[in-house]
Amino acid sequence: MPTTTLQIPTADGLADAFAAFPDSGRRHPGLLMYPDGFGIRPVLRDMAAELAGHGYYVLVPNVFYRNGPTPVIELPDYIGEEARSGVMAQVMPLIGAHTAERARSDAAAYLAFLNGRPEVSDGPVAVTGYCIGGLLAMRTAAAHPDKVAAVAGFHAPVGADGPELFSTVTAQVHLGHAEGDITPEELGELNRSLDAAGVGFTSEIYPGTVHGFTMSDTDAFSASGLRRHWDRLLPLLERSLPAG
């Protein structure tokens, strides 16, 4: 599976990125993947390669590029209980500084870059994200409804901007919530907001999961949660994007 590192021009400089894509010589649908707060690392590269194997050109940007290239912070190979507090102390200021205005500006640059790649077929793309990346994915879909056909967020605070964020979303949506992140009552409120905005969506709690359940390099990982993530994400992409 071909992979490469790239530099994406943005309003504030160059964002380094990772890309994985099929080795076919043909053009394929584009997919913008926003990492979780821990950033680009082997587990994200593996997930991008998995998606590329299903026929997509997958672009994974370093959303914290303003603070330096990947790795923005040094991470242990495995983020367990002992390491987590120290890692989070570094990550949270980065998340706090990544404002909605910055996110919208970057999203425009990422989409323009993705759509301009010679390996990417014409037409709308999909956007997926994990943790804070899920919120960035939803912001991207809201800001660019003509360019995003599908959006997925996993263990993501997608409601953080309020229900008005959903008013311009035309993409098909799947949200996979950690059981430890959201109550059934909160899920009902979120789903009613999506309904009211006319969004086509599925939104569910993944049983027995905690925040970060898709990430196999952390103690939050759930093998069953990751399988459900693939079982929901891949059909969404197949329904929403042309065949790769």
Q: At which residue positions do the language-model features occur?
A:
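N-terminal cap/leader regions of alpha/beta-hydrolase-fold enzymes
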Residues: M1-G244
